[in-house]
């Protein structure tokens, strides 16, 4: 009885606190503003064309079997319809790839926020042994021996293929072309009140109000770009040898002193090494 009373009191407190929260306390969810421009890497048609070419080029992986679209398939929302992402040979992935839709609006990249920019993420993913496992110097040599690619680099950046502009090109393609823009919801938020159904409007009201979704999924891109621990239980797949291998490999790569004892996905802690970030993950769009 005492335990039940405690639970009821706790529930009452939570309900009381939640009832004081208004959707007006959070950034509204639309419409999308113009995508932010990186002043050091502004878009041009030549840069976008080069980035698209590289995005779908299998030579950017060490095995020659993977490219960016291996994990970010355009036809499935620029992500994968599977539990885990594709991994380079010799590894398994423990996470699924976030969608690239509207990635140019994101302030945080990758589930644990380890990438400081889209430009650096493109290079990092190419070199990462788990993702594409390509030697970046070898890749630049391959690209510099491709006359068409050399011509495209020169048109886009005034230089021959190099690591920095390789990352720049892929980033500018993603940032300025993979955008929802004119979805029915976008049209609704721009004033077309017939663009979505009455049921969808009611769902939006719940999303912004009683359901409380907007507390984390707010702003035009439906994310606060922050990291949260939502109480995920440990994935039982992590007991398997191949998952233990990737957990420890990544923990060691990210400089965790306790990498040998890691048996769960630490989330944001991998980047910050701060226990306050244990099992926190980025709010997805």
What is the role of each PLM region?
Residues 1-9:
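Bacterial N-terminal signal peptides that target proteins for export
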Residues 5, 19-285:
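Periplasmic c-type cytochrome electron-transfer domains
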Residues 8-16:
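Bacterial N-terminal signal peptides
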């Amino acid at each position: 009885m005492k335990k039940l009373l405690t639970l009821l009191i706790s529930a009452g407190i939570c309900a009381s606190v939640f009832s004081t929260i208004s959707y007006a306390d959070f950034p509204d969810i639309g419409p999308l503003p113009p995508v932010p421009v990186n002043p050091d890497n502004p878009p041009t048609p030549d840069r976008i064309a080069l980035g698209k070419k590289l995005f779908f080029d299998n030579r950017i992986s060490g095995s020659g079997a993977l490219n960016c679209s291996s994990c970010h398939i355009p036809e499935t929302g620029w992500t994968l319809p599977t539990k885990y992402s594709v991994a380079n040979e010799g590894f398994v992935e423990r996470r699924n790839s976030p969608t690239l839709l509207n990635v140019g609006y994101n302030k945080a990249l990758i589930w644990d926020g380890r990438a400081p920019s889209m430009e650096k993420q493109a290079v990092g993913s190419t070199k990462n042994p788990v993702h594409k496992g390509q030697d970046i110097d070898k890749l630049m040599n391959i690209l510099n021996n491709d006359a068409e690619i050399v011509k495209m680099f020169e048109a886009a950046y005034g230089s021959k293929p190099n690591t920095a502009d390789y990352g720049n090109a892929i980033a500018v393609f993603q940032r300025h072309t993979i955008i929802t823009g004119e979805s029915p919801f976008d049209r609704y938020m721009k004033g077309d009140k017939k663009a979505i159904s009455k049921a969808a409007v009611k769902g939006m009201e719940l999303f912004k109000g009683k359901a409380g979704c907007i507390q984390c999924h707010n702003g035009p891109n439906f994310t606060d770009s922050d990291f949260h621990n939502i109480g995920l239980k440990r994935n039982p797949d992590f007991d398997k040898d191949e998952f233990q291998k990737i957990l420890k490999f990544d923990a060691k790569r990210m400089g965790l002193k306790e990498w040998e004892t890691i048996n769960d996905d630490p989330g944001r802690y991998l980047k910050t090494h701060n226990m306050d970030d244990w099992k926190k993950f980025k709010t997805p769009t």
